[in-house]
Amino acid sequence: MTVTTPDALLAPHDVQHAGADESAAQIRKPRDNNDPRNANRGGGNGKPRRDKRDVHGWVVLDKPIGMTSTQAVAVLKRLFSAKRAGHAGTLDPLASGGLPIAMGEATKTVPFVMDGRKRYRFTVAWGEERDTDDTEGRAVATSPDRPTAEAIRALLPRFTGVIEQVPPQYSAVKIQGERAYDLARDGEVVPLVPRPVEIHELTLVEHGDDGRSVFEAECGKGTYVRALARDMGRLLGCYGHICALRRTVVGPFDESDMIPLEELQALCDRAASGEGSLADALLPVETALDDIPALAVTRADAARLHRGQAVLLRGRDAPHCSGTVYVTVAGRLLALAEVGNGELIPKRVFNLTGLTASSAVRKESI
């Protein structure tokens, strides 16, 4: 062994209003088997029938403004005809940027992305606090005052490190089984409990004469940038809310990994004519595991792990690491496992049969 340390394809501008059959309406040419939108039309009731397939990997969508994270997942499931998909951390509808979406077996690695750091670039409009802490809400407090750049910079250390943060009223935090935003929409004002979050870095990038300031922040899991703007405004005595927000980094993914929805649509159109594959848009499942060691095993040991059996680690080739590792065989991802007490114990086994990121062809698992 060696150690190597929704039913419609929605366009961004009409996400709230698109009809259920818009995605297929513009395709006139016959579709071949490369087209993930290919539907079997010969159902007994005469209605189109869509076959779902196994797709494994990550797509880092450059989410457009106006689309919810749930809608984005539905769009990609539709586009790939994927059986299973989920996102690795909600991004507000009014925000743009990186929304990592896990397909198939990649959903087993979602916690590794959600626990990673996130980086945002955001703009705060001073002089007004809103109930949603962004431009969508109604004003609840106003001030004619505007902060100076010096006052803002002097405040930033108070919002760096581990701080106590009260989530926005309009947030996905659960209160006795209900989402805070549902209660807020019903007119209920429920006190939210402060909770610790970690902000690794907070920088003032620009400070304009228009009453707005641009920041960059790198923070940990559970941080609300809207709450950050709200709290800075209160301490500066001028109030504030988010008027622009973009996520630029999520765990191992940055802007170079992001793909716009229009580009995915174009790739799908090319696949329909046999000129490409949606596999080109996928990142490997193990991309989410960059921060943990990789352990290569023999095919014999791989067969045991695949059956859920532990493997003894001994001899000079035994790994020197402990804890969680991801296991490969012949360069192919096999499992998440724990190293301890001289054993390699499988925790999550991957079955990568179907469309994967490694090539434009389908591969079989061991």
UniProtKB/Swiss-Prot annotation:
The lineage of its organism: Bacteria, Pseudomonadati, Pseudomonadota, Alphaproteobacteria, Hyphomicrobiales. Transmembrane segments: none annotated. SUPFAM superfamilies: Pseudouridine synthase (SSF55120). One of its GO terms (biological process) is tRNA pseudouridine synthesis. This is tRNA pseudouridine synthase B. Residues 1-55 are annotated as: Disordered. The keyword tRNA processing applies. It catalyses: uridine(55) in tRNA = pseudouridine(55) in tRNA. It comes from the Bacteria. It holds the Pfam family TruB_N. The gene is truB. It comes from Rhodopseudomonas palustris (strain ATCC BAA-98 / CGA009). Its EC number is 5.4.99.25.
